[in-house]
């Protein structure tokens, strides 16, 4: 199994496996065994892991806001009265008898579906399903009376507090998925906030004009009921009520019908395109299939759903909005402050389990010994798959889309923020500007009318401009973008607002736990001279003029670039794009790329204080420079020792000793020739268990554990992952670009596969002893200082407390 996971949500529990097609019958055998009888192994250690998950949720203010929102919208229905993880009292006295009863009542064949998507022989697969699941006996399901909520007739206000920046969320209860009201709500949400372009009313009137830091609308439909939500992050010195009023003003525009007549057609076309794109992947198609089952709908109904949307008129939307949007919503204010509703579940203190990793049951032996026809890996011949051509002297790379009418083109520029860090500001500003022909709002509307998505990504060494949509519209989209780039107009007022937004966003980032941890880990890895800290200064932003950055964006039309096209008809693309794609004869002054050093990691412990229930620790150690000859060994090391449910770290730290909810060790390979690899060691746990968890991790890493059977499984899993992986579509081209950065022009998976085939535990141990064991680490820790065992932390190395200003660089 390449990937094994599961999730639980309001109406579903879904187990997900990604398996090679040649292992399908083995998978059926294992799943037959797993779902035929419940065996609660590792129960008390896994229970403590659930305590950890509950406590991690206390540090996630998005989750806390959602709990309050659901409770307010659904005061009697399980949607709002029963969270997925449960309440603290549910976790304190769990009953194994009740768990068995639940399994026996609900894990019955008339209450679940098998959803299989991929390289399948359908007739054989159906026979396998019958063979292994056909003898499961259906049972009458427990009867549940349908709970009907009373209509909401007032505004329900709730407050959540945490250290992060303020924001708000407001929502109206809707009817269930598949109903006319749910469809109406979906269309209104997209009129307010379009999925793929910034052409909705919130996008244009609030985000584009920067009246708030961020605003959006969305619909979340359930099997019974659902909701339409609007959210906003206010600007500095803007109250939550002011942001709320701005959101309500946009709803009033919908009520008045003040949105373009063409918008519904554009939204529905966008929905069709999203459906095509989603069904191109196994994950996307399988999700659609299992959601159809959960919602008790037929696949025919799902396919015909778009036709139901097409029947809805603008007049229908206006009437719906006036009937639907009343003072009957829930609103959650997320204020900055101490969480006064904090609930901590204390760990009971458990006895660690001794895992016998060498033991194999007769069933496991039979599965492992069963021979299957081997899947042969398919490696890409880039020169064969990527056709090269040119348009007016500009290099053109082409991969044919043989599936549908979706197309994509990319302008690739071989430089980025390492050459000029101000490029990121230039293109941030660019997105808010218009031309002599189109205002900023009109520009977004034109792209949306065409059904063309546009995106500009500025990386450290590359600028990638992407245009995507239906192939028949791509040339018009390229023409529009070319007009925008060549004719963009500087606007001093918009620039000042963009600067304020950038500076306010930086302050918001300094209040967010994830951003703080990312900044602290970067500081532990690189020190002060890092890309993370090297941002355009506040002084430069305030003293510069709009034209300084606009000219920078416009000037890239004179820079060297190449084009990638993914679609059906190359010759038609060349003909249509010939007037647009041209090689400039003008000189383009490109500054040399700045070099960011990768200093040695020498044993320091960097700490930043943050008010949270748990503590997070990330140790980063600089290894040797990247070497293709080690790719196979590092892959197997991660699989065997450090990452995933079958790794030694997960089994020992979480399953056997329950010292952390999340723990892993990852050998992170550099993607660039001449740069260093890093080893990352992460633990997320309760503050009082950090010392024990670190001690256990250090014990595991002192010497690579020698477990031959587990090594064989990890090796075989790594081989099967490569053998069953298929690089397709646009991925071939971008994988090729990544391979070139390492200094190669061939599919390096071939080298990795051959290396793993010849790998044994002795060779992996030698790699560990030479490349990993000698590494010294810097440590990043975030948590509430008063909760930490400073004596345990002081043993990790030289302790340095760093401020937010030090780690962020502003």
Regions found by a protein language model. Name each.
Residues 40-42, 94, 312, 487-496, ...:
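Peptidyl-prolyl cis-trans isomerase
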Residues 123-159, 199, 204, 276, ...:
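Proteolytic maturation boundary segments
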Residues 33-40, 133-140, 248-259, 483-490, ...:
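A common structural junction motif
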Residues 3-33, 64-89, 111-117, 166-176, ...:
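M16 family metallopeptidases and their MPP-like homologs
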